[in-house]
Amino acid sequence: MAADDGIRILPLAGIPEIRIAADLGALIGDAIERTDGALPLSDLDVLVVTQKVVSKAEGAVIDLTGIVPGQEALEFAQRYDRDARQVQVVLNEARRIVRMENGVIITETPHGFVCANGGVDASNVGPDSGSLVTLLPRDSDASAAAIRRAVRARFEVDIPVIVSDSFGRPWRWGIVDVAIGVSGIMPLEDLRGSPDADGRVMRSTVRAVADEFASAAELALGKAAGRPVALVRGAAFTRGDGSIRDVIIPGVNDLFR
C-alpha cells in the first residue's frame, strides 16, 4: 500500500532518556500524541524505532566494570588502543568471528547479522552511562511486535514496526541504518518475474523494503539529535508476518563466507 501525496517522515519529539525496564511502548504512544501532524495514525504509517532505546528498555546492557578480558581481547586491545573489556564483550556476543584486523572486529551475531563489533556499542547509552555498553536485542522481531501491540492497543490502528540499527557496508565508507527487527511488514519485495519499465523480465531484483524504511527514517532522526523514533508515512509496503530472518542469506547461498 502507498499514498498518492508523497512520503513524509515525522520524528517523534519528547521521548525521554530511556532507562532499563522503561515502558517503551507507552513512551512512544505519548510522543505520537504530542507530534503535530502525526494524528490520526494511518494504515499507511510505519513506525521506525532505533535499536539503542529498545536495547536499553529491555536491559540489553552490560557494565564493563564486571568484565574480565581474556588474553585474545587484551592483545587486540593493546595493539589497537581499544578497551579490552569491550573487546571481550564483542567476542562473548559473537557466534563467529569473521575478521579481527586493523582495529576492527567483524562478527556474525546469533541473529545472523554480520557487522562491526557484533552490535556492541558505547555511544548514546546515556549521559550518566559511565562504563555501560549496549547489546543488540535478543529477539528484535519480538521487540518490534511488542511495540506494535502497545500502539495498536492505545490507538486502535495496526501499524507495522521496524527496529533499526546502523551497519557499515563492505567496500564503501560510511554507515546506513538497516532493519534488524520487523513486525507487521514483509521486509523484502520480490520482483523477480515481473516486467521492468521496458517490459523486460526482472531476474534478480529483490527490494530490501524494511532497510529502505530504516534508512529513510534516519534522514530525519540523525545520530546525535536525541530522536530515536519516526513515523514514515505514505511509502509503499506489503503487510504480513515477515521476519528479519527473511533477509539473512543462508550460508549455502552466501558468496562471501
PLM features per residue range, with description:
Residues 1-46:
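N-terminal glycine-/serine-/threonine-rich phosphate-binding loop
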Residues 44, 49-52, 57:
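Short, conserved active-site loops that position catalytic residues or coordinate cofactors/metal ions
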Residues 2-16, 51, 61-67, 72-135, ...:
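A structural signal for small-residue-enriched, beta-sheet-centric alpha/beta enzyme cores
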Residues 27-28, 56-57, 169-170:
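Conserved SET/PR domain catalytic loop and adjacent active-site segment
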Residues 22-39, 138-159:
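Phosphate-interacting basic helix/loop segments used at nucleotide- and nucleic-acid interfaces
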